[in-house]
Amino acid sequence: MVSKTWICGFISIITVVQALSCEKHDVLKKYQVGKFSSLTSTERDTPPSTTIEKWWINVCEEHNVEPPEECKKNDMLCGLTDVILPGKDAITTQIIDFDKNIGFNVEETESALTLTLKGATWGANSFDAKLEFQCNDNMKQDELTSHTWADKSIQLTLKGPSGCLKSKDDDKKNGDGDNGKDGDSEGKKPAKKAGGTSWFTWLFLYALLFTLIYLMVVSFLNTRGGSFQDFRAEFIQRSTQFLTSLPEFCKEVVSRILGRSTAQRGGYSAV
């Protein structure tokens, strides 16, 4: 029984560690969260002291940077609380760590990427943390916009590039190199053909529309003051004449373009 429990625990730890690799996670790999870390702080007056709260965030193990001195090296979230009394050095009164071996859950919505960290031990208590990354690709670093620490839950909202989807250029860098480019080139050729076909189709539709309008206007002018039946008969007659004369008209246009019209040939005599 003990061996089964140990094996299950070992497997669960391996699963969690692997899931923290953002490039291997189905959702996290789509976002820029693996490129950035942040150290934010807020200051508030707590007379006679000043309290400073700092939050160190480095979600993905691919982004290897050193955390603050008081935090652990494998922390993905670390909270520090410093208290400063007048004329004295700052004293760190609280440190809470969420390392990369704890469980977590990822959720993506239209407005944010949310990462929930579960079960960090702080003294005799267990805490969860909810990190909400809102996209702003005009910012170079993430900024903490709000934070709450109530009961046994911590909520942090950050705005910046981490919550933004990766660009196509980033996806190409993670692709197959030249093979991916060849595939793209082959994929673009049918698009060009489709564009040419679309242009010809629109030209034909415009010509048909203008012809229809022309026949309707001429029929209306010739039957002005008459009944709808007169207009209908005139329109059908002119449409029929147009359709029957269309092949001869096209033949005449082609002949003139190629310089082989009967009028041109009639202007010369054999020597």
Swiss-Prot record:
GO cellular component terms, semicolon-separated: clathrin-coated vesicle; cytoplasmic vesicle membrane; fungal-type vacuole; Golgi membrane; mitochondrial membrane; mitochondrion; phagophore assembly site; phagophore assembly site membrane
Transmembrane helix among keywords: yes
Signal peptide (residue range): 1-19
Region named Disordered: 161-194
Keywords: Autophagy, Cytoplasmic vesicle, Disulfide bond, Golgi apparatus, Membrane, Mitochondrion, Protein transport, Signal, Transmembrane, Transmembrane helix, Transport
Domain MRH intervals: 20-166
Lineage, broadest ranks: Eukaryota, Fungi, Dikarya, Ascomycota, Saccharomycotina
Functional summary from the UniProt entry: Effector of VPS34 phosphatidylinositol 3-phosphate kinase signaling. Regulates the cytoplasm to vacuole transport (Cvt) vesicle formation. Plays a role in ATG protein retrieval from the pre-autophagosomal structure (PAS) and is especially required for autophagy-dependent cycling of ATG9.
Example GO biological process: vesicle organization
Membrane topology: Single-pass type I membrane protein; Single-pass membrane protein
Keyword Zinc: no
Comp. bias intervals (Basic and acidic residues): 166-189
Gene3D superfamilies: Mannose-6-phosphate receptor binding domain
Note: Present with 8970 molecules/cell in log phase SD medium.
Family, similarity comment: Belongs to the ATG27 family.
Any one GO molecular function term: phosphatidylinositol-3-phosphate binding
InterPro entries (alphabetical): Autophagy-rel_prot_27, Man6P_isomerase_rcpt-bd_dom_sf, MRH_dom
Lumenal topological domain: 20-199
Superkingdom, natural source: Eukaryota
Cytoplasmic side: 221-271
Transmembrane segments: 200-220
Name of the protein this chain belongs to: Autophagy-related protein 27
Gene transcribed to yield this protein: ATG27
Disulphide bonds in the chain: 22-60, 71-78, 135-164
Assembly and interaction partners: Forms a complex with ATG9 and ATG23.
Compartments, as annotated in UniProt: Cytoplasmic vesicle membrane; Golgi apparatus membrane; Mitochondrion membrane; Preautophagosomal structure membrane
Pfam families noted in UniProt: ATG27
